[in-house]
Regions:
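Histidine-acidic metal/acid-base catalytic patches
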Residues: 3-22, 27-137
Length: 137
């Protein structure tokens, strides 16, 4: 699935409270362009954003879920242009109710939960300060 299909489900629901959650990992792995797809969705229909980053090469399609569950990297530390994703949403006027970090990375956890939490937090703040400082206020 991609954002266009997800948006069609939200639209077809006819519910005012049906909204979209965007995630940078899914965005990159679905090969979504920055400039085109987001235009069809009103800014107020994007309720939440999850940021993270991706490895340089995706896992094979048959095991892509394994990448999602073990190798998402901290925002700005991979190859997915997390800052560009955030800038796209900021320029569209998106004001999400929540911006979260969804980093699931065995390498970070092996260094300890304290390391994983601090490293992920520090890199998320760095990306957001650069690309979308309003969400930090």
């Amino acid at each position: 699935p991609d954002l266009e299909k997800g948006w069609k489900v939200v639209e077809a629901s006819g519910c005012d409270n049906a909204k979209i959650i965007l995630d940078t990992w899914h965005w990159v792995r679905a090969n979504q362009p920055f400039e085109k797809v987001i235009d069809m969705i009103p800014a107020d229909k994007i309720v939440s954003v999850q940021i993270n980053d991706v490895q340089a090469r995706p896992y094979a399609k048959e095991v892509l879920r394994d990448e999602s569950m073990h190798d998402r990297v901290a925002p700005g530390c991979g190859y997915g242009d997390t800052a560009g994703f955030c800038k796209m949403l900021q320029q569209k006027g998106v004001k999400p109710n929540a911006v979260g970090v969804e980093v699931i990375c065995d390498e970070y956890v092996e260094k300890g939960v304290d390391f994983a939490a601090k490293y992920t937090y520090d890199n998320a703040v760095k990306v957001l300060k650069e690309a979308w400082p309003e969400v930090l206020a």
